[in-house]
Amino acid sequence: MEKLSEKDKELIRGSWESLGKNKVPHGVVMFSRLFELDPELLTLFHYTTNCGSTQDCLSSPEFLEHVTKVMLVIDAAVSNLDDLPSLEDFLLNLGRKHQAVGVNTQSFAEVGESLLHMLQCSLGQAYTAPLRQAWLNLYSIVVAAMSQGWAKNGEDKAD
C-alpha cells in the first residue's frame, strides 16, 4: 500500500478538521453530485423508501445512514494517514461488499469526483490545487485496496 507525503497528510488533516465534524450534510453534497454524474446508481439502493429520485434517496433515513457510513470511512482514512496499511483488510472487504451489490469499479472514479466536488463546495477558496492532489492521492490508495477486494470477490464467484 502506498504512502502519502507529510505535506499531503497535513493538507488532508487540515481540510478535514471542520468537515469531519458535520459529516452528513457534506455527505449529502457528495452523493447529490454522484447521482448527477450517474443517475443509474440510484437503482442500487433498496430501502423502505424507494430511491427513484435523488431527493427520495437523500430524504430516506436508511440512505442517510449509508451516507454516514461512507463519511466514517473517509474519517477513518484521515485518522489513519500515518498507518494506512492498518485499513487494508477493511478496505478489501468494503470492495468485496460493493462488488456483491452490483457496484462496478467505474463508479469508484465517480465517487472520487464527487468527493472532490464536495470538498470544493465546502472549502471554497481553501480548496487549492495542492489540496485537491493530496485528496486524490489518498483516494487512489483507498480505491486501489477496494478494487483488489472487488476483483477478488468476482474471482471467488467465478470459481
Curated annotation (Swiss-Prot):
GO molecular function terms listed in the Swiss-Prot or TrEMBL record: GDP-dissociation inhibitor activity; heme binding; metal ion binding; nitrite reductase activity; oxygen binding
Keyword NADP belongs to the record: no
Recorded catalytic activity of this chain's protein: Fe(III)-heme b-[protein] + nitric oxide + H2O = Fe(II)-heme b-[protein] + nitrite + 2 H(+)
UniProt EC number: 1.7.-.-
Domain Globin, residue spans: 3-151
Subcellular location: Cytoplasm, Cytosol; Mitochondrion matrix
Biological process annotations from GO: cellular response to hypoxia
GO cellular component terms given for this protein: cytosol; mitochondrial matrix
Gene3D superfamilies found in the cross-reference section: Globins
Group of enzyme by EC: oxidoreductase
Keywords, alphabetical: Cytoplasm, Heme, Iron, Metal-binding, Mitochondrion, Oxidoreductase
Annotated heme b binding sites: H66, H98
Keyword Nucleotidyltransferase set for record: no
Function of the protein: Monomeric globin with a bis-histidyl six-coordinate heme-iron atom through which it can bind dioxygen, carbon monoxide and nitric oxide. Could help transport oxygen and increase its availability to the metabolically active neuronal tissues, though its low quantity in tissues as well as its high affinity for dioxygen, which may limit its oxygen-releasing ability, argue against it. The ferrous/deoxygenated form exhibits a nitrite reductase activity and it could produce nitric oxide which in turn inhibits cellular respiration in response to hypoxia.
Subunit architecture: Monomer. Homodimers and homotetramers. Mainly monomeric but also detected as part of homodimers and homotetramers.
Family named by the database record: Belongs to the globin family.
Identification of the protein by name: Neuroglobin
Native organism: Dissostichus mawsoni
Record lineage: Eukaryota, Metazoa, Chordata, Craniata, Vertebrata
Gene expressing this chain: ngb
